[in-house]
């Protein structure tokens, strides 16, 4: 039965869904990496697809930008479509000095300036963390493929254009690897609904050093990350 935001039918989604922010990126993943692909939803042009990777069923769907958007889609996938594993695949801006362009960052935990997890937890702090079994498998796959990987805390920001110019130096001091806009929300929804979640990010720019990938480097880095994510998806 369709939800307000996903017009797929029961059974259309695999137990594991890879989720980029951009729905066109979801389309690219499906067409590039999966076989026997079927588009299963398109409400608001938030495309979802299901296919196979090395013979195993995998789905991919966009989640939009920011915590409010991704929380809607992740909630409905888990609560209404029986999805058990959500793996966010996206990009981040690095802040720690030892994190470099094209590294893969795996969010073991996700700090945030959003209040969504406090709302869930009676205004208390909630430690938004990845599922360890997904985390362990992703690190294993990255090392097997010789993809440079950093594992640790990320920061999920509500504002892309932040007025807090000094916040990134504070993040670096506290050991935060990089900044995205969704991980903390996804981890909160998954915990609330009893599912597993992981965030895998490619470093597209370094916020403090002012470095950025070229379009060609960005694509290669994304493809490397996707191979890690897909191998994780079929081995959990």
Swiss-Prot record:
Keywords: Glycosyltransferase, Transferase. GO terms for molecular function: purine-nucleoside phosphorylase activity. SUPFAM superfamilies: Purine and uridine phosphorylases. Phosphate binds at residues 21, 25, 44, 88-91. Its EC number is 2.4.2.1. A purine D-ribonucleoside binds at residues 5, 180-182, 204-205. It is an enzyme of class 2 (transferase). It holds the Pfam family PNP_UDP_1. Belongs to the PNP/UDP phosphorylase family. Catalyzes the reversible phosphorolytic breakdown of the N-glycosidic bond in the beta-(deoxy)ribonucleoside molecules, with the formation of the corresponding free purine bases and pentose-1-phosphate. NCBIfam families: deoD, PRK05819.1, PRK13374.1. Homohexamer; trimer of homodimers. PANTHER family: FI09636P-RELATED, URIDINE PHOSPHORYLASE. This is Purine nucleoside phosphorylase DeoD-type 2. The gene is deoD2.
